[in-house]
Amino acid sequence: MDSLSLPTVCDVVVPALNVDNLIRDYVSNVRADDSNNVSRFLGEVALKEIKSQVDTSNGDFQKLNVGFRLTPDEKNALKANFPGLEIAFRDSCHSSHSFAAAHRVCETLNIYNRFKTKTERIIDLGGNYVTHAKQGRSNVHSCCPILDVRDGARHTDRYISLAASVENRHRELPVDFCCHKFEECDVKAPFAMAIHSISDIPISTVATHCVRRGVRKLIASVMMDPLMMLYDKGHIPLLNVDWEKEDVEETGKTLIHFHFVDAPGLSYSHDFDTLSQYMITNQVIVNNSYSFRVERTACLSGVYIVEMTLSMTDGHSLAYLKPMRDVSCAWLSSLRKKVFVKLAVPISAEWYTEQFEVRHALMDESLVRYVSEAAFRQFSKTKDPETLVQYIATMLSSSSNHVVINGITMRSGSPIKFDEYVPLAVTFYVMAAWRYKMIAPGIDAVKTRTEKNVDILDEKGLIKEDFNVVNALLEDAGLIEPKLPHFTDVIKNAGLRGFGKKTIEKTRDDVLLIKPRSLLREVIYTVRSVFGLTILDSDYNLVSGVPSHMKATHVWSVFVGNLAFPSCLNVNECVNELLVNHMEMMEETKKEETRQQAFKDARDRALMTIAKAIEKDQTIKDGLLPILDLCKIKEELTAASNSLSLTPEAIEQTDSRLMKASGSDVNPYADSIKEAIHYFNEVEVANTRNLRSLGIYLGWSIPKNKQTYDALQGRNESVRVYVPYENKWYPSAPTSQYERAMTVDGYFSLPMEFEAITDGCRREISKYHLLVVDDSCIFCSGQRMIPALEAALKLVPTFKITIVDGVAGCGKTTHLKKIARIDSSAAGSPDLVLTSNRSSSDELKEVIDCPDVMKYRIRTVDSYLMLKSWFSAERLLFDECFLTHAGCVYAAATLAQVKEVIAFGDTEQVPFISRLPEFRMEHHKVKGKISCTTDHLQMSKRCHSLFKENFLQKQDCEVSERCSSLAELCPIQSVIQIQPERDVLYMTHTRADKETLMRIPGMPKDRIKTTHEAQGETWDHVVMFRLSKTTNLLHSGKGPDLGPCHNLVAISRHRKSFRYFTVAPHDNDDQIVKCINYARSLSSGDLDGVRVLI
């Protein structure tokens, strides 16, 4: 900039959560897991609920990893300075200035988030472009000039960091930087940021080039201290930085040096005149056309956030160019309850002269008050000043240092500088002497008669008005409201001034100023002031507040030719343009969504047509089968089955059997079917949320510590992480094949062969750092059944339901085998036999006598609903119907067009239980006509008569003598006392106990089940175990909804022996323990009395 353009300076909004409702829902839905309690529920479920309502991917809730090792005080300071950032302290590396480095990282993210944009361009003055690239900030352009060797070394370090990122991450890094100065770069952007990089650039230059580059707002962080305006040196505590000013005589400049105490090789020097501009400037006017508002918005442990905001216009007013002379309070937070005390410090010890430097010391207001009061109490005219100064110095010493007695801090203060110790004591002595001298005049002043506002009111409450003859005559002469004083007042004020009388002047309501007046003294003072002799007079203003030069009232003006802002500044035009662009973008987005949806619907209709051909018998040849070898139909069908575009309308258009119900006729079981659809969708949402939370925990990147993978299995041992770059699974290889995996972009289809990912799939997923899977990724049956459930809603069923209700072990499955008609030669259509689980289906295929070609009609209800086309039958036999949601039973019966449904089950055993504790079901039980007239269905061949008295609610059921052995109670202290045995089923009520036993080496994991999972199975020997001493509703059988059904399932799985291993053998609330103890008290005759012989 030339001399003509030098600047001149002149002094001038989640829905609120109801915690009571959360607790109430938890208490009413508590189930088998005894580790669940109120604190865990509030800590996990409520936290998930809050996170689901808050966008944590951007803005104030971003997680920031800080690897520097910090002290607890430094960590607390970072959290206090940046409350909107979720900071994770890793303590993985050490630095001599760790807090300053960590603070700089937090400043960068904090200032970047203040702009609230990821699309608008941002200029970073001297920014670390590698850090921006790693964080995915593609909208940041960094101006990184090389001004000295330190800047060049920074580029080397950034290059090394960038090379490591390219090698490890294998993904695009949005690097955007230049080596030009801010004044020379031509990149334009509406926003700019500077992290400790503008301390050497005059504020007028910054404002000028902000106009040239189209910057509307600049936010910078500057290391400053308000005491720089007062002292020559100081210290910033947490940053551990010493600063010192130095006057350079050759250049006439004042430099300020910053020295990091623990980093001797790290120091900075700036021109103090330039740095101080950011302390005291309120406004910068450029070319009398543009105006920047300068604000210091926050003080963060010695780092001030300075904002320069360009003023917009209304198109006709120039009020935004008016200099603003208000007072900034930027420093007041640091100077609160502080005062400046005047003192004189000797700077020479020569015999012929004594030179004193008069300056101010910053002290606590409470300390000044305490010492000044004590000094006045000890003051005496009989004592010499030296002795009194010693007394005051002693009080200063004890009051300004920490006093600790028995480990308790009784007084805390700030130490006084060595050269200010005695001069401060002299100042307090002068204050005490001056106050002592003012006692006599004060006595005269307080005795002076004065008037209050109430004294000038008359009896009616009106102000008394004295008649002034002179003012009345002047009004008659034509003057308007003359206000000459009364003649008596003039006599009082000027009459005896030369003889020491006083005058009284009213300053404000009920406040009067009493001034002694002496004509002779006033004349002498006037003569002395004319000749400049008053400069040596005494000044007792020894304590003052914040100096005026620290209150930021400066306005800068700068002029540069050919300068114009590149965009519009009219607020009306800018707002209108923004809204118009937003509407156009919304319309374009809507058109694109409509086009994508139309494409998906057309694709799904075509794929459903092909699917019917794929489901045909492979022995039947037609023209569609060769398509499988020509294109990727199977992959497309897999993608289509997971698509939400498979609506019932799409199925209706491809299957002629699905005829719409006419008029108001709908499926009478719609409530149950819709509840099943809603449940499966909620389970899918929960699975997706859990997998995403695991990925977010890893940061969707490869962790440096391999033990992090083990931590993921804390609550779910099925979690696995696949790293494409290493082609390796963590923490261990999978035991199953997965059909999908969660990535940072969502689910990804994962074709596997022999538990290994195919080469083609590996190439496609190489762009991801890692993939996360768990048991929900093996096979997602719920989402595959939804199209069938939705299709069933459109049909009107004609079947009737008969429920064959039998106790555990009474032979319900045997009865089903007898009445099943699956032979193709049977009269009418063969039966359809469905089960709730695969083990029951495999068992029925073995025991039901039918040709192999007809065994496809014996299957699970899930597999039937997942068919692309459903075969029909006249009768549906359903085994263990209460283990499946009633909506699936009704939908299968509707799609099979059956006329009769015979459902086998036990109403006293465990019903269908939701995996989601917060999901409440109302229509999950199959309803129909109860039938248990068959004699042998009223007798249990598996359950001892003892348990009939305690568990079975059916009054007409009986037990068989065949099960004559008693149950055995086995007290244990630890899980390791349970030994692995062959042909034994291990059962427990809670999943936590199951996971604990599965960790024991040698235990058969396939034979360890919960009572809910073991329902419907029969074993000769059963071991029931309990590893928690806390009794829950499952052990006591006092649940309001389930009752003792879990205990009934537990004791009805064995034929020969039942052993109960428990850590709480004396728990009287445990229903099984209570029954076993009761059995021990009975004789064989007592047991025979209740047995029924066959």
UniProtKB/Swiss-Prot annotation:
What keywords does the record list, in alphabetical order? Answer: ATP-binding, Helicase, Host endoplasmic reticulum, Host membrane, Hydrolase, Membrane, Methyltransferase, Nucleotide-binding, Transferase
Q: What is its EC number?
A: 3.6.4.-, 2.1.1.-
Q: Where is the Alphavirus-like MT domain?
A: 88-279
Q: Which GO terms describe its biological process?
A: methylation; mRNA modification; RNA processing
| Superkingdom of origin | Viruses
Residue ranges of the (+)RNA virus helicase ATP-binding domain? 777-937
Positions with a binding annotation for ATP: 806-813
**Compartment list:** Host endoplasmic reticulum membrane
Q: Where is this region: ATP-dependent helicase?
A: 802-1062
Instruction: Enumerate the residue ranges of region (Methyltransferase).
Output: 68-409
* Record text on subunit structure and interactions: Interacts with RNA-directed RNA polymerase 2a.
Q: What is this protein called?
A: Replication protein 1a
What species is given as this protein's source?
A: Tobacco streak virus (strain WC)
